[in-house]
Amino acid sequence: MAKEGLALEITELRLGLPGDNYSEISVCGSSKKKKRVLSDMMTSSALDTENENSVVSSVEDESLPVVKSQAVGWPPVCSYRRKKNNEEASKAIGYVKVSMDGVPYMRKIDLGSSNSYINLVTVLENLFGCLGIGVAKEGKKCEYIIIYEDKDRDWMLVGDVPWQMFKESCKRLRIVKRSDATGFGLQQD
């Protein structure tokens, strides 16, 4: 059953982006025009209602290229946000757990707030309320030594590597008595 004159081409499925200007299509031997784009309708209504001077300006407007509608899902905003958040997360150092021998609780500190080993030692002394915490370079003078767990789950002395490398690899801090810190390269008196 062929139904002529019902304008079924409006609901016809086609491949292509919305707003593409298709040439005339033929349905059952008759030639009809495809649905018009909004810009075409605006210029044709302007031609009907305006005088001769405005017709000349609208013809000049038609010579400009027609802007096609933006494709759905472009630009890929979600992947941009995901990538940006991953970059920010990698820049942010974050909090690490700190435990001390003889203290029944653990604390967390933000390594990003410290800018050197000296500043880190000061923060830890204030946090646990004790003096005499030191890093590897001043190990003989201190009662306590700070060790840290790196990405490879190895325990190392704080102060053996440059500060930036320490911030990137530190997962956990532990404050131990100097006498208990054997196997870390400290020389006993």
UniProtKB/Swiss-Prot annotation:
The keyword Transcription regulation applies. Induction: By auxin. The N-terminal half of the protein contains two conserved domains I and II. Domain I includes a slightly degenerated ERF-associated amphiphilic repression (EAR) motif which seems to be involved in the activity of transcriptional repression. Domain II is required for the correct degradation of the protein through the SCF-mediated ubiquitin-proteasome pathway. Interactions between Aux/IAA proteins and auxin response factors (ARFs) occur through their C-terminal dimerization domains III and IV. A motif (EAR-like (transcriptional repression)) lies at residues 13-17. Keywords: Auxin signaling pathway, Nucleus, Repressor, Transcription, Transcription regulation. GO terms for molecular function: DNA-binding transcription factor activity; identical protein binding; transcription cis-regulatory region binding. PROSITE patterns: PB1. Aux/IAA proteins are short-lived transcriptional factors that function as repressors of early auxin response genes at low auxin concentrations. Repression is thought to result from the interaction with auxin response factors (ARFs), proteins that bind to the auxin-responsive promoter element (AuxRE). Formation of heterodimers with ARF proteins may alter their ability to modulate early auxin response genes expression. Homodimers and heterodimers. Interacts with TPL. It is found in: Nucleus. GO terms for biological process: auxin-activated signaling pathway; de-etiolation; response to auxin. This is Auxin-responsive protein IAA6. Belongs to the Aux/IAA family. Residues 93-178 form the PB1 domain. InterPro entries: AUX/IAA_dom, AUX_IAA, PB1-like. It comes from Arabidopsis thaliana. It holds the Pfam family AUX_IAA. One of its GO terms (cellular component) is nucleus. Highly expressed in stems and flowers.
